C-alpha cells in the first residue's frame, strides 16, 4: 500500500506491504533501481546510510523498536527505510511500525526541506528508544519488588523477557549510532546547511545516550536475573537438604522398632514397658544424628 502526502517542499510516498503492481510503479514511474528497492523492503536489513551521486538519491535505513503482537511489553527491532530521490521522499516499513509515521504526521511541520524533515524523524526515532528503555526499566523494577517478597517462576520469566528485549534494543541503538556517524561524515563533506549539521550533532548525542542507557539497563537486568536465579537455586538446595536430613532422621524409628518386630529373642522383649525404652532409645539416636549433622554444618 502506498499513501501519498504532500508538503510545501516535497512529496512523500509512504509504502507498507508492497505488492507487485506498486513495485512496478516505483520501478517505472519513479525510476527506483531494483537493487535499491530490494534493500529498502528487506525486513532484515541493517541500519546504514548510502549516497548514490549518479542516481541523485540518498538511502537511510534506521532501526526502531517494535512491540510484539501477542506480548505488547516485549520488543524487537524493525527497519524503516527513507529514500530521497529528486525531492521526493519514499518511506518503507512494516504495518507494525506505522505508529511512528502517525506521530510524524501529527507533530512535524510541513514546511521543512526533505533532508531536515528526515533528520527530525530520526530524532523522534531516537527519542522513542529512550521511552522504551525507561518503560522496560520500570517493568524490571516492578518484577524485582515482587521478587523481594517471594521468588516465583513468573517473575523470573518476566525478567528474562525484559532482558531479551533489551538485547534487541541495544543492538538497534548500536547500529543506529554507526548509521548516524556515517551520515554525519557525509553531510559534513557535502552539505553547507549548518542547521542540519547541528541537528545531526544533536542526534549523535541522543543516540549515544540511548546506547548507554540500553547498556546500563541490560547490565542491571542481567545481574538481577543472575542473582534471582542463584537465590532460587539456593532455596532449592535448602529444600533438598531439609528433606534429606529429615528423611535420614525419620528412618531411625523404623530401624529401631523393626528389630522388635522380628520373630527373634531380644532384650526386654517380654516386658510390657519395653515400648517406653524403645521410644527413649529412638529419641536419643535422633538427637545424636541431628547433633552430628549440625556440628558438621549439614544443617
Name what the model sees in each region.
Residues 25-27, 208-211, 215-299:
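Hydrophobic alpha-helical transmembrane segments and their immediately adjacent juxtamembrane loops
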Residues 35, 54, 107, 150, ...:
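Surface-exposed loop/turn and secondary-structure junction residues enriched for glycine/proline
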Residues 143-146, 150, 176, 180-183, ...:
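Hydrophobic stripe of amphipathic alpha-helices that form coiled-coil interfaces
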Amino acid at each position: 500500500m502506498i499513501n501519498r502526502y504532500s508538503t510545501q517542499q516535497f512529496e512523500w510516498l509512504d509504502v507498507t506491504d508492497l505488492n507487485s503492481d506498486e513495485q512496478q510503479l516505483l520501478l517505472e514511474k519513479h525510476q527506483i533501481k531494483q537493487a535499491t528497492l530490494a534493500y529498502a523492503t528487506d525486513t532484515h536489513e541493517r541500519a546504514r546510510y548510502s549516497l548514490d551521486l549518479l542516481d541523485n538519491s540518498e538511502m537511510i535505513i534506521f532501526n526502531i523498536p517494535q512491540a510484539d503482537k501477542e506480548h505488547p511489553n516485549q520488543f524487537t527491532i524493525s527497519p524503516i527505510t527513507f529514500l530521497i530521490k529528486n525531492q521526493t521522499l519514499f518511506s518503507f516499513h512494516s504495518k507494525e511500525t506505522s505508529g511512528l509515521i502517525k506521530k510524524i504526521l501529527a507533530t512535524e511541520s510541513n514546511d521543512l526541506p526533505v533532508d531536515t524533515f528526515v533528520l527530525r524523524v530520526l530524532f523522534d526515532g531516537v527519542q522513542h528508544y529512550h521511552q522504551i528503555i525507561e518503560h522496560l526499566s520500570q517493568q524490571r523494577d516492578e518484577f524485582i519488588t515482587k521478587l523481594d517478597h517471594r521468588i516465583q517462576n513468573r517473575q523470573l520469566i518476566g525478567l528474562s523477557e525484559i532482558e531479551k528485549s533489551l538485547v534487541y534494543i541495544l543492538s538497534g541503538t548500536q547500529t543506529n549510532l554507526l548509521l548516524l556517524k556515517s551520515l554525519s561524515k557525509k553531510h559534513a563533506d557535502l552539505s553547507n546547511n549548518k542547521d542540519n549539521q547541528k541537528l545531526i550533532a544533536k542526534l549523535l548525542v541522543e543516540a549515544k545516550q540511548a546506547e548507554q542507557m540500553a547498556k546500563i539497563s541490560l547490565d542491571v537486568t542481567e545481574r538481577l536475573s543472575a542473582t534471582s536465579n542463584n537465590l532460587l537455586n539456593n532455596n532449592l538446595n535448602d529444600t533438598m537438604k531439609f528433606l534429606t536430613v529429615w528423611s535420614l532422621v525419620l528412618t531411625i524409628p523404623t530401624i529401631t522398632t523393626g528389630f522388635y518386630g522380628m520373630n527373634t529373642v531380644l532384650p526386654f522383649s517380654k516386658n510390657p514397658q519395653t515400648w517406653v525404652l524403645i521410644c527413649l532409645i529412638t529419641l536419643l539416636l535422633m538427637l545424636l544424628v541431628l547433633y552430628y549433622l549440625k556440628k558438621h554444618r549439614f544443617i
